[in-house]
Amino acid sequence: MTNRIEMMIPLLLYFFFIMGIALWGNKKTKDKTGTSGFMEEYFLGSRSMGGFVLAMAIITTYTSASSFIGGPGVAYKVGLGWILLSMIQVPTAFLTLGVLGKRFAVIARRTNAVTITDFLRARYKSDAVVILASLALLIFFMASMLAQFIGGARLFESITGYSYQMGLLIFGLTVIMYTTIGGFRAVVLTDTIQGIMMLLASTAILVAVITAGGGVANIMSSLQAIDPGLLTPQGAGGSIPKPFILSFWVLVGFGILGLPQTTQKCLGFKDTKSMQSAMIIGTFTVGFTMLTMHLVGALGRAVVPGIEIGDLAIPTITLKLMSPFWAGIFIAGPLAAIMSTVDSMLIMCSAAIVKDLYFHYVARNDETKLPPRKVRLMSLSVTGIVGVLVFFAAMEPPSLLVWINLFAFGGLESVFFCPTLFGLYWRRANAMGAILSMTAGCAAFFFFNISKISVAGTTAIVPTLVIAAAVFIAGSLLSKDNTNDAELHKIFDF
């Protein structure tokens, strides 16, 4: 009992600190007058992110339970090869901001875009594109949040010894409350704190593993004795074939350009200098976190052998090597990764309902029909309701948790990748191409996953994006040419 209390103290202090930031963010939203002013503040923080905050917001939104629990768990099983594979994720911030950042930000300011759907509306001038994007975002985000809620509660349960329901209650209600109260500004500031917690936690547990193992050389000798395959790029038992590496490059490499939760951050930074510094800081942060946590998993097998379930590797290693108080500080790291993913998705779900659907199609962009007080109440209510729905769904966790998360992220990429990228850089891109690509991409992703059909040994995301791109290009070329649209030229600088 004493150990539990000692473990909970740093966690509770951390949660209270986050709630304080949310209350400060809430005060900022009250300072904004007018419907548009409130929505820009609540959903985008008035485009005020500096470089460090922007870097942390992108990286912490991208990283999740898999970065701290799932990935290191696989590294525990297959060895150093998985660390090499995880490094594919290092350019996340550099790629997102380098390819999308400045162009996205300029267009967003010209069109007053607050969400990714606002951008799609301005680019394609199609209600079908907007509605498809909003529905896909809501469905896949809620599925992904469900997986994150369950992952957070199970992590809490495995380390503290409290029940799954208690973990879900503490974790779930905390993230729902601070996101609902504080909006985007609270989200990015808590993401910054959570990014720092992730760095500290990953460093602490790696030092503990190396110390307990008697140094890196000794640990490597132990891994060699367990299975020489643990030290090879192909992994134990040749479990990392080349087609899988290609698939990983697509899914967590350039495929991230199709994830709305990361591209949304491109709309909110302050200036070009902030973007450039974020590219450097973000690249270092994700590289350091991925390297340290996956090293913990791979090296941990020599220090704490015999863990049968990969997902239990990090919690078990933490409990074996750290005191209750420091274990409590460590758990804040992966919980921070999960919370920072959920909070961004919550705020974007609220924006999709209030800004993209209700304000545009019901209020017809008329601020008199949606005055500041009403939009404030509606935004806070929708954020809270979406969070509570996911919370109750997580009370009885489904057994197919891995598939839910896979469908969510792959589904988002299949829907948003082509309309976003082609919309920014290809003059001929039009609504027909976007509609066909979104529907065909989503259908293809589900087909390849359900049928288990593999193309040249790759996973579903590779043929899915090829099909989505081919359909987008064909649909755009075979339909009306809008390249001479004067308004389009003015907005997109073609």
Where are these regions (language model features)?
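Membrane-embedded helix-loop-helix hairpins and adjacent transmembrane boundary segments
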Residues: 1-494
